[in-house]
Amino acid sequence: MRLLVIECATECCSVALFEQDRLLGGTAQVLGRGHAEALVPMIAALPGKGQAERIAVSLGPGSFTGLRVGLAAARALALAWRADLLGYPTLALVAAMACAEASSRTDKAPVSVAMSGGHGEWFLGEFGPDGAALAPPKSLTPAAAAQAARADLVAGSQAAALVAARGFGQALTILPDARQLLLLDPALLSQVVQLHYGRAPDARLPGGTLLSDTLFDGAWPGTPQ
């Protein structure tokens, strides 16, 4: 059974095609912007044009636009191919990648994940040595994130900045990569495919209802409730 993975939560857009535990093909591009234009050609360049029985897409937290682009493509392909649609938490993939890299050089250790967020904030997640989330991710100012980060090992796009801000620790600059999905605990692949932006949009619907109230249900895949 083939699995197509779509990762658009950050400035790095990546895709991968697996058959069981074997990577058939994949690519990653650091774009900043332009995920919508790049994603479909990247999928089409995969073996068999990326067609698969299952599709996994990054659910965030991350870029509003990138997450929506990834999910829209995943839903369209799942409908066209009659494929199963799954989602996974972005920061958990970064943590899994960091744990794999760190364990090759030292004993397993907890990891804090710090990624670029919106409005100058950072997404911060805390993970155990096995990559399991210890709490839901938060969107914090850089100063607050530096204070809140628990682990000596910090991974993500803002890892170096966080380590510099607090004055200690080891930084692994990592962006989520679809080609590394098999590092993630399979239990984190969820059939509940709902985006988690990590912070509430600064907008209200007519009548004053916060847009965030329509986007969040408080449940983060793989995190304690």
Where are these regions (language model features)?
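Short, conserved beta-strand segments within well-ordered enzyme catalytic domains
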Residues: A16, A28, R54-S58
